[in-house]
Swiss-Prot record:
Contains disulfide bonds. Its main location: secreted. Expressed by the venom duct. The keyword Secreted applies. It comes from the Eukaryota. One of its GO terms (cellular component) is extracellular region. It comes from Conus tessulatus. This is Conotoxin TsMEKL-02.
Amino acid sequence: NNPPCCSGYVCEGVYCAVDV
């Protein structure tokens, strides 16, 4: 399952990356 993306992050694959 993909992790929930918190505010300030964006889903990228199976993890969340910082949305710059």
